[in-house]
């Protein structure tokens, strides 16, 4: 699953394995390397999705509720990964209903209520 973007790009099997292992570790799933998606919990599937999105170091990341179904500790770890992506030059546009999770991070955010701008 995480390897797919790298396979499409035609990367070597060795490089793909290294990158997949690196990102499985980053999202705390290195112990689940051989599992099929149906064997993973909802939160674990969410973390695999984040790893797949980050594995190619994209310039733009669109994240719709990336911390949904995750416990608070894993949510913080995922936001840390997204912050690392921004530090590397990526733009992250994230939607969330969990304002207390993102507010302390002091990143630029906008708040919408019924489609209207409330805070910028």
Give the residues covered by each predicted segment:
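Interfacial catalytic loop of ABC nucleotide-binding domains
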Residues: 18, 34-36
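Conserved ABC ATPase signature
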Residues: 36-40, 44
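Conserved catalytic motifs of ABC-family nucleotide-binding domains
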Residues: 57
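Helix N-cap at the start of a conserved alpha-helix in ABC-type nucleotide-binding domains
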Residues: 72-74
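ABC nucleotide-binding domain "signature" region
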Residues: 15-27
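Catalytic Walker B motif of ABC-type/P-loop ATPase nucleotide-binding domains
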Residues: 61-64
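Hydrophobic anchor residue at the start of the ABC signature
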Residues: 50
């Amino acid at each position: 699953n995480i390897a797919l973007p790298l396979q499409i790009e035609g990367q070597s099997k060795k490089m793909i394995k290294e990158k997949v292992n690196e990102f499985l570790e980053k999202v705390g799933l290195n112990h689940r390397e051989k599992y099929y998606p149906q064997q993973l919990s909802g939160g674990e599937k969410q973390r695999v999705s984040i790893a797949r999105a980050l594995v190619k170091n994209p310039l733009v990341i669109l994240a719709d509720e990336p911390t949904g179904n995750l416990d608070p500790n894993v949510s913080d770890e995922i936001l840390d990964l997204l912050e690392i992506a921004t530090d590397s030059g990526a733009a992250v546009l994230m939607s969330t209903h969990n304002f207390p999770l993102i507010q302390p991070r002091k990143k630029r955010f906008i708040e919408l209520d019924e489609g209207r701008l409330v805070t910028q």
